[in-house]
Amino acid sequence: MQLLDIHKRVVTLEDTRELKVPQPNRVHIVLSRVKGSKNKDTEGMSDADAIDLIKRITPDAIIGGEISNKNAAAIWALMGSGHDNCMATIHAESPEAAYEAFIKCIMEQSPHINVEKTMQEMHRKLHVVQIVRDGNIRGITCIT
């Protein structure tokens, strides 16, 4: 986030507020995975509602939290909405495994997607930055 221009409008979408965004023009949307959350501003808001809200805000950058079975289809839709800077995280052993994990998560909400077409589209649209941690040190080991 430090690499983004300080004047950019940044929107974050997380299930737990963890990201620290230095840009003053920012909006944090927190959607809890737990019913009865203390976050009254987004209580009852679905992932699809959040995606619609984010599109209306017209951010310069969208930073999602961790991709999960619940939010993957919505995040994929958002990544295809024409916003240039969209980032999220997913746990995987390799870049190819990250693509596969993303598709598996999308299929939880959208089981009838064309897997081959979606995989090709992901390879065309997404860059995977693989980060490995060794103790307290993190390093980039691959960029696709």
Language-model segments: which ranges?
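Switch/coupling sub-region of P-loop NTPases
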Residues: 3-123, 133-134
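Conserved P-loop NTPase
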Residues: 122-144
